[in-house]
Regions:
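Alpha-helix N-cap/helix-initiation motif
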Residues: 2, 16, 131, 183-186, ...
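Core beta-strand elements of the Rossmann-like FAD/NAD(P) dinucleotide-binding domain
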Residues: 6-9, 183-192
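Generic hydrophobic/aromatic pocket-lining and core-packing "Φ" positions
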Residues: 24, 96, 217-218
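A glycine- and small-aliphatic-rich helix-loop capping segment at beta-alpha/alpha-beta transitions
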Residues: 29-33, 42, 56, 208-215
Length: 219
């Protein structure tokens, strides 16, 4: 087994789309180093293809995070984790504000503020968007921020590596094994692991997203 690296204080993030980049940024802001693992560059992730928008209950149409959470749970047939959904809807307005202030090119209303539109499963307009390329604009902002922390050594991106398996004891994961797509070299990384590998498109015969999201990490 080649290149065994012990990084107990380093977070290992599997996936470098919007979720993976966001996780790395949060760790970096707190001074924690992270390594992003992906088999392709962030610029080619599934997140780039997202078109619809980002939901957040801002001060429009008497909306509120509680209503946002209620409608999100209903749209998901109440399968979702209620605590996680409520946390998401509480934090969503700040995320929109931060993205706008970071330069994300949202479609604007007549007051030069991010506009909202209707979307499925919602009784009010709460979807913030960037024309029909919301995902691409979001990734521009996240990648730009990640590069700044890369320069400081707080974020490292390992591209071209595929996840093989978690290393686990009886209670938790303590690392993972990777293989290089071209050379088949194997690498072991030690540290806490975050799974942000995206959806399961490749597991289905028909999917509207990229089949590069094979679902292999989840499987």
């Amino acid at each position: 087994m080649a290149d065994v690296r012990k990084m107990k204080e380093t977070m290992i993030i599997i996936g470098s789309g919007a979720a993976g980049l966001s996780a790395a940024l949060e760790f970096a802001k707190n001074g924690t180093r992270s390594i992003l693992i992906s088999d392709m560059p962030s610029e080619r992730s599934q997140s780039v293809m997202a078109e619809g928008g980002i939901n957040a209950a801002m001060d429009t149409q008497r909306d509120c995070p509680e209503l946002h959470a209620e409608e999100t749970m209903k749209a998901g047939r109440y399968i979702a984790d209620s605590k996680a959904v409520h946390q998401m809807t509480e934090e969503a307005p700040k995320i929109i504000k931060d993205l706008f202030e970071s330069g994300m090119a949202f479609t604007l209303n007549e007051n030069k503020k991010p506009d909202v539109r209707a979307f499925g499963g919602q009784s009010v307009k709460r979807t913030f968007f960037a024309a029909s390329n919301t995902g691409k604009q979001l990734m521009y902002v996240l990648i730009d921020q990640v590069r700044r922390y890369e320069a400081e050594g707080l974020i490292e991106r390992l591209t071209g590596w595929e996840f093989l398996k978690l290393l686990c004891d009886e209670e938790q994961a303590y690392g993972c094994t990777l293989t290089h797509k071209v050379t088949q070299q194997e690498k072991i990384l030690y540290g806490k692991v975050v799974i942000a590998s995206g959806g399961l498109n490749g597991m289905f015969g028909n999917a509207t997203g990229s089949v590069r999201n094979t679902g292999a990490v989840t499987a």
